[in-house]
Amino acid sequence: MKKTLIIGVTGGSASGKTSVSHAILETFSNERIAMIEHDSYYKDQSHLTFEERTKTNYDHPLAFDTDYLIAQLKELQYGRAVDIPIYDYAKHTRSQETYRQEPVDVLIVEGILVLEDERLRDLMDIKIFVDTDDDVRIIRRIRRDIEERGRTLDSVITQYLDAVKPMYHQFIEPTKRYADVIIPEGVSNTVGVDIITTKIASILND
């Protein structure tokens, strides 16, 4: 059985990781390809009150159930389907619903800390860091969290200053050294994206 090609895509919050991932998905739309988000593996917090959940540092490695992600990636590599958890951003906890992911030839694993855990890195064939200016990222995050995740402006800014920014410099930015490719400015860097897709095509055609 052909080994699943696993691509890790990381970078700071609102850096353009998802856009880069979607560009790869679109390029190889004729292949068996899928994307899994690390955010889906935030730990279940249903045992906590809503107020307690809002105080969780979601940009810290301990907020994620990375063991679960690794286990499911290995299942997919062995050709077995898995049920991916769904995270409810409005309720700040894991939803009771899941979605079925069948084995694929190419799997993109996207998230702010996917290069932080060595065990996760070891599963990846290509590791990408999307490098975008802090000011651009905070503006994007404010728009996204208010429009798509039902957040207030004050809560977004408070979370950014208290957790997102310090965690980026402590945990996320240092993982840049593990990346095979660093893409400044995300999907607008068409040359960088083309280099990635060319490499993926080369591996698939071997």
Curated annotation (Swiss-Prot):
Keywords per UniProt: ATP-binding, Cytoplasm, Kinase, Nucleotide-binding, Transferase
Gene3D superfamilies tied to this protein: P-loop containing nucleotide triphosphate hydrolases
Pathway: Pyrimidine metabolism; CTP biosynthesis via salvage pathway; CTP from cytidine: step 1/3; Pyrimidine metabolism; UMP biosynthesis via salvage pathway; UMP from uridine: step 1/1
Disulfide bonds: none
EC numbers for this chain: 2.7.1.48
Major location (coarse): cytoplasm
InterPro entries, alphabetized: P-loop_NTPase, PRK/URK, Uridine_kinase, Uridine_kinase-like
Record protein name field: Uridine kinase
Binding, ATP: 11-18
Pfam families per UniProt: PRK
A GO molecular-function descriptor: ATP binding
Highest rank taxon of the organism: Bacteria
HAMAP family named in the record: Uridine_kinase
Subcellular location: Cytoplasm
Reactions performed catalytically: uridine + ATP = UMP + ADP + H(+); cytidine + ATP = CMP + ADP + H(+)
An example Gene Ontology CC term for this record: cytoplasm
Keyword Kinase applies: yes
Family: Belongs to the uridine kinase family.
Biological-process GO terms, alphabetical: CTP salvage; UMP salvage
Keyword presence, ATP-binding: yes
